[in-house]
Amino acid sequence: MKSPLGPILGTVLAAVLAAGLPAEAAGKSPDARLRTLPVNSIRAVREYFRYRGPSDMPIVSGHRGCREDGCPENSIRAFEHTLCRVPAFFEIDPRMTRDSVVVLMHDPTLDRTTTGHGPVSEHTWAELRELRLKDVHGNVTDERIPTLEEAIRWSAGKTVVNLDVYTPKEVLGPLLERLGFPPHVMLTIHTPEQAEYYYALSRKTMFSIHIKSLEQLEAFEKTPIDWRNVMAYVGPRMLPENRELYERLRAKGVRCMISLAPTYDRRETPEQRREGYLSDRDILPDVIESDYPIELTRALQSLLGEERP
């Protein structure tokens, strides 16, 4: 049966394609192969993430880069592989080594995603440099663990990196300050206290704030943050009972983001995931995060009978 969301998903596809503005619109691309985003100033980043209305075009986020085509999560290879095919920004995970170097690693331990063993915090950076990353199937790749600074420098002029903050603020804050609080670095914020701390350090940093209820929204409204700097993570799906929350966020120009990582991304095959990606939703999200950003884009293209090289 033809999905009643077909016309709406046309908007999704338009967003996925338009999000990666050509070099002429977004500034000269550092790599002509990559589908870059307009990220060279806080003004450009704010405008890119600003919610404008119900016909607004959703944005795609790669969760930890991507898990596709043998790419290990939280790797430069995953970022580049994705941007060579679709425009996206990336949620990444900073963790600190024993000698206070911030690296990209989701888990507190090395075992699942690397050739190492034990807690990240019990190893030095020199030790971690000798390891190799594994893909989602456990296959060892040639990729090494990147530092956060390497990821930030690589993504400059290309895309936004959204840091899920596990690293102590006393370490992450000074690191970002030393780098000049780059406009393409976004911070995932869980509490009003975190928001106030980082906003005091830089008023030109974008936040991805967890706001899943009106009570949480009201708590963040008591902080001095600039709502032009905010995208809201509202949960794994948009819920009809939370319409008032979404309306209040959007009235501030704030986009509402969902993550498919805990839902459809967990399905075993591309066909099963595609079915989930294209299933009906009562309310269309403004930002969609997925472990499989390329699959998601191609599923939407397939629905519309579109082809992309």
Role assignments for model-derived ranges:
Residues 8-20:
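Bacterial N-terminal signal peptides
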